[in-house]
């Protein structure tokens, strides 16, 4: 794998979350340094977080992000290589290329570490 940042595109298969909103994987980015060391980013599109026309507020989205970390991201870590120090789960109402400023997009981010086989929320 080397030291290069790697990305794997997602697909349009809906992923179940507690709120019931439609969520799809945009991409997974790994082998990228983060503030806590090796970081894996799972980036999801969740149109219902949009401020206009959306039905999911931030507090509801937080529960969805925890569920995505526990039931989607964490089980897939073994397929990506070394266990990361941190997992970032992001939701965006529209697909945004990684590293691109998109002030028109609504985006939520949460950071997690893995402890005792579960995702532990971290201050981000």
Each predicted region: which residue ranges?
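Surface-exposed beta-strand edges and their flanking turn/coil or helix-capping segments
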Residues: 38-40, 54-57, 102-104
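Generic secondary-structure transition motif, activating predominantly at the C-termini of alpha-helices
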Residues: 33, 73, 113-116
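A generic short-segment signal for beta-strand/edge and adjacent turn/coil regions
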Residues: 6-14, 54-61, 113-115
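Generic alpha-helical propensity signal that fires on short helical segments
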Residues: 41-43, 60, 105-109
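Polar/charged, Gly/Pro-rich intrinsically disordered segments
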Residues: 82-124
